[in-house]
Amino acid sequence: MGKRILFFLLTNVLVMTTIVIVWSIISRFTNFGGSFETGGPGLGIDYASLMVFSLLVGFTGAFISLAMSRWMAKKMMNVKVLDPNGPLTERERFVVEKVHRLSRAAGLMHMPEVGIYQSAEVNAFATGPSKKRSLVAVSSGLLDAMDDDAVEGVIAHEVAHISNGDMVTMTLLQGVVNTFVVFLSRVAAIIVSRFVRSELQWIVQFAAIIVFQILFSILGSIVVSAFSRYREYHADRGGADLAGRDKMAHALRSLKAYLDRTKLNDGTDDSAVQTMKISGRGGVMKLFSTHPDLDDRIARLEQR
């Protein structure tokens, strides 16, 4: 899921920044859009209009990001989509059959696209704007490093994300976060622009909006990451229901064993495994991790 969240957050930041830049340019050179400054008492900001604007931009950006998620993932990772009716290798056929079988067990009416991408990293992700237009992709490194039961557990976990509707839920949360990001960045930019000469206020405010929006987006990702960690436990339970608790636990232990071997071989954490956030992080960086600590996930699964 780490890849899925990374794609979504990256796309969201790009979409939101583009919307704000276009809106700022249009409102600067036309009467459309206008200013949220009233010149009244206090900061002189029309908070009601700014909040409506922030809601529209925030949720528009989130849902555009959702709509682009599957396409973005396939392009960025160079995913080879597998045709279930076409010629496939034995390993490819295994992945397709497992995804379809587990999807049917999860009650999905439309089978997800299935893909493999060439990478040494041990990873898999599910993405897509809806249950009807979803994608489950696994890395070649995962297929090389894991046995069939572990691969099935990983696939079950990803199918559970689709069945649980995690992308849509994440989008709604991101829309709320975006709303506050837009609102607060505008207020902060207006305040900053008051400290420069009037002829420079527009360009300073424009630049400040971009800077504050990126800064607040990073802070907002803490909220999104916390929700992602919470949903990972649900996906583990869903994967256990679909493939069996033993296979789901075996998949998590296999991931941990791979990480431990990597540390033993070179004395450092494998960056590819860190992409999955399966090892957990300490200190402040733990706030930005999209996955809980792997030992904690195994312990919770075994307590079911």
Swiss-Prot record:
EC annotation from Swiss-Prot or TrEMBL: 3.4.24.-
Membrane topology type: Multi-pass membrane protein
Single annotated GO MF: zinc ion binding
PROSITE patterns membership: ZINC_PROTEASE
Main location (coarse class): membrane
InterPro entries according to UniProt: HtpX_protease, Pept_M48_protease_HtpX, Peptidase_M48
Domain of life: Bacteria
Residues given in the record as Zn(2+) binding sites: H157, H161, E232
Localization of this protein: Cell membrane
Transmembrane segments: 5-25, 48-68, 172-192, 203-223
Pfam families to which the protein is assigned, alphabetical: Peptidase_M48
Cofactor(s), by name: Zn(2+)
Active-site residues annotated for this sequence: E158
GO cellular component term of the entry, any: plasma membrane
Record keywords: Cell membrane, Hydrolase, Membrane, Metal-binding, Metalloprotease, Protease, Transmembrane, Transmembrane helix, Zinc
Gene Ontology process terms (BP): proteolysis
Stated family: Belongs to the peptidase M48B family.
Identification of the protein by name: Protease HtpX homolog
Species of provenance: Halalkalibacterium halodurans (strain ATCC BAA-125 / DSM 18197 / FERM 7344 / JCM 9153 / C-125) (Bacillus halodurans)
